[in-house]
Amino acid sequence: MRLDVVTIFPEYLEPLNVSLVGKARARGQLGVHVHDLRDWTYDRHNTVDDTPYGGGPGMVMKTEPWGDALDSVLADGYETGCGEPALVVPTPSGRPFTQELAVHLSERPWLIFTPARYEGIDRRVVDEYATRMPVYEVSIGDYVLAGGEAAVLVVTEAVARLLPGVLGNAESHRDDSFAPGAMANLLEGPVHTKPPQWRGRGIPDVLLSGHHGKIARWRRDEALRRTTANRPDLIERCDPAAFDKKDREMLSILGWQPDPDGEPYGRFWRRTPGMEE
């Protein structure tokens, strides 16, 4: 996979040289190219922004440097046979970045990131390149950052760890929170390691039992427990058919039951009356 990042702060992307992403780069599994947007400015101040049409506070990033930068990146990528590119635009007004989307992006051969600053990039840039390639406008949360570089780091790590051979154990992400399949709408439960005793706190007996079926059931129950406590919205929009008998028994213990009035894309589960906190 090839990743290109166009930014006015190339140094912000230094963390891509360390940890799993850095190792993937060293092994040739991931090619990362960071470009300084100001290399495509032609005035003595290296201007990348201007005042917004219609008035209002803040500045807007200009079309010309972004257009020239993206054209240059695309030309280089096409010349080296990178496959079909996709543009990833970090923005608080984008679609939520989810594990499902991370999996989808990990299957693409080439991603180009456009982290913005100020009030964002002139909309015409996104509209222009949407005629040439798929565009993903993504948000990493319901908050606003000073720029999109932090979001690039988040998305890159989420995507890179899904590439074949990047994780030491190919099964490591199977039980992740939000992983496609059985964990699609659940948070991962707690994990433990040695020593077996620490400051008077032990390990749940089931994890020491060697009984794989019981361990799997305990982990599933703990995932349900954590999800209902921390992200009840995930349970509310689940289809009860996605849960087996044991799941439903655990959800009942935790104060949840099927909603007989649930509609598709609505709330499928609700707290049992009288058990709300």
UniProtKB/Swiss-Prot annotation:
Gene3D superfamilies: 3.40.1280.10, tRNA(m1g37)methyltransferase, domain 2
Top-rank taxon: Bacteria
Origin species: Streptomyces coelicolor (strain ATCC BAA-471 / A3(2) / M145)
Sequence similarity: Belongs to the RNA methyltransferase TrmD family.
Annotated binding of S-adenosyl-L-methionine, by residue: I140, G141, D142, Y143, V144, L145
InterPro entries: Alpha/beta_knot_MTases, tRNA_m1G_MeTrfase_C_sf, tRNA_m1G_MeTrfase_TrmD, tRNA_m1G_MTases_N, tRNA_MeTrfase_TRMD/TRM10
UniProtKB keywords: Cytoplasm, Methyltransferase, S-adenosyl-L-methionine, Transferase, tRNA processing
Subunit and partners: Homodimer.
PANTHER family, alphabetized: TRNA (GUANINE-N(1)-)-METHYLTRANSFERASE
Biological processes annotated in GO: tRNA N1-guanine methylation
Protein name: tRNA (guanine-N(1)-)-methyltransferase
The EC number(s) this enzyme carries: 2.1.1.228
Classification via NCBIfam families: PRK00026.1, trmD
Leading EC class: transferase
